[in-house]
Regions:
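Active-site helix-to-loop segments that bind/position phosphate- or nucleotide-bearing substrates
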Residues: 224-251
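Acidic, carboxylate-rich catalytic segments that either coordinate divalent cations
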Residues: 347, 359-363, 367-424
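Conserved G1/Walker A P-loop phosphate-binding module
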Residues: 1-102, 360
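Canonical P-loop GTPase G-domain recognition
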Residues: 150-226
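Conserved Switch II/interswitch segment of TRAFAC-class P-loop GTPases
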Residues: 108-127, 140-155
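Short hydrophobic membrane-inserting alpha-helices and related fusion/pore-forming segments
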Residues: 266-279, 326-351
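Hydrophobic alpha-helical transmembrane segments and adjacent short intramembrane/lumenal linkers
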Residues: 294, 298-336, 340-344
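Transmembrane alpha-helical segments and their cytosolic interface motifs
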Residues: 51-66, 245-284, 310-320
Length: 424
């Protein structure tokens, strides 16, 4: 789960590619000036991340619930670092963990490692936290503090429980027992005259095992931990830039969907199909998929797009979406446009509706796939079909359908000059 320098440099190259694509497409769209400031900011962030690969100091979050001894532990670590130079490479910050709510997902985005402090068995939120940190390539050490509050048998039992928890993690996490602020020890003294006296004396701090552990884990793995943090940040930057690029592309994609929905409507109106299921092949065609894929950087050949369209149309029929779309549009026509209930009009509007819903679903999927860096060959048409079903359910409001029907009737009714010319 650790990263290396090569992985970071590859990710930085991907950021540069997306930045250049965004710049080129913005210029082509006449929006170069509008993106100049954010483009410059993103380029500066990229350079900063490139340079951060060279840092030697580790950012360590000291995490634990209230009153687990985090502050005292940090003071001891900072004091020890004055005499133990390697520990001075640890830049510590304190984070309080609420057992009920946990912490925000990005709370530890800039941390190279996490030192989790507990005074007993772990809560589920603490276990979830270290599991997520391990999965993100961050270093993790678990410090069992206040061990002086336990008798030897109970101390061993808690330690065993903690080790069992960490054994379930993808990579090993060390557990160390410490006493950062041990309770005073009661000492009884017997005087020569036979009298006794009792005093409380400070017990020795038990932190050496933690100092050794931190040097053996965090500090020994500094290059890999720095690379892992930088890689997370570079990937986050790529998603930010890709989000901006998606926004730029969305206007182009919507314009294409607007055009293709009326092309499909005109085709279905002019040549009604014998069964409504065949509307899927009219509405969801290779041109729609190829054009939208190209907008978002998923370059499919026409043959690949036709095969994909056939798959998506078949899934659409299987899910009953053609029948559903026809039913909702027929209901709207009966209520508001009864004069235009002819079969050709219904099929034309149904084709337009399906094309629009398929187009919006493809746009949504392609945007998320671009954010995730999904290659073209891994595009899931089943996932797109599921999104299409969700889109139809979300966009079944009467007002939206009335607007679509009104536009469609104006285009398809007898005498409308644009009825068939939209396919030009």
């Amino acid at each position: 789960l650790m990263a290396d320098r090569a992985a970071v440099e590859s990710a930085l190259d991907q950021v540069e590619t997306v930045l250049q694509t965004w710049s080129d497409e913005a210029e082509a769209a006449g929006k170069a000036e509008a993106i100049a400031e954010p483009l410059s900011r993103f380029q500066s962030q990229k350079q900063t991340l490139q340079a951060s690969l060279e840092r030697r100091q580790l950012a360590v979050a000291v995490v634990g619930e209230s009153r687990t001894g985090k502050s005292t532990l940090m003071e001891l670590l900072q004091s020890q670092a004055m005499a133990d130079a390697p520990l001075a490479q640890l830049a510590l910050r304190e984070v309080t963990l609420a057992s009920e709510t946990g912490l925000a997902e990005d709370e530890f985005a800039a941390d190279d490692a996490v030192l989790l402090v507990t005074e007993g068995d772990m809560t589920q939120s603490a276990l979830n936290l270290i599991q997520a940190r391990v999965m993100d390539g961050q270093g993790v050490v678990l410090a069992f503090n206040k061990t002086d509050y336990y008798d030897p048998a109970d101390r061993e039992a808690v330690l065993h429980q903690l080790e069992q928890h960490t054994a379930t993690l993808p990579t090993p996490v060390e557990v160390v027992s410490i006493a950062a602020a041990p309770r005073a020890i009661k000492v009884r003294r017997y005087d020569e005259n036979g009298t006794t006296s009792e005093t409380l004396e400070a017990a020795p701090v038990e932190m050496d095992s933690l100092y050794t552990c931190l040097k053996r884990t965090f500090l020994a793995d500094t290059p890999a931990l720095v690379a892992a943090t930088t890689l997370r940040q570079v990937r986050g930057l790529r998603r930010e830039v890709q989000t901006e690029l998606n926004t730029l592309r969305r206007d182009r994609a919507r314009a294409q969907v607007d055009q293709l929905q009326w092309v499909a409507a005109a085709a279905a109106f002019a040549n009604p199909v014998p069964t409504i299921d065949l509307l899927a092949t009219v509405a969801i065609n290779g041109q729609l998929i190829m054009d939208l894929g190209k907008v978002y950087g998923f370059n499919l050949s026409l043959e690949e797009a036709k095969t994909a369209a056939s798959t998506l149309a078949r899934l659409t029929v299987k899910l009953g979406l053609v029948e559903l779309s026809t039913q909702v549009l027929t209901a709207v026509l009966k209520s508001h446009f009864a004069t235009y209930l002819a079969g050709g009009i219904v099929q034309g509007l149904s084709a337009a509706y399906l094309t629009r819903m398929a187009g919006l679903s493809l746009m949504e999927y392609f945007e998320e796939a671009a954010l995730a860096g999904t290659p073209t060959q891994d595009v899931s048409w089943e996932a797109i079909a599921a999104r299409l079903r969700s889109a139809i359910q979300r966009n079944g409001q009467t007002r939206f359908l009335q607007s679509l029907a009104q536009q469609g009737i104006e285009r398809l009714k007898p005498g409308a000059k644009v009825a068939l010319s939209v396919a030009e």
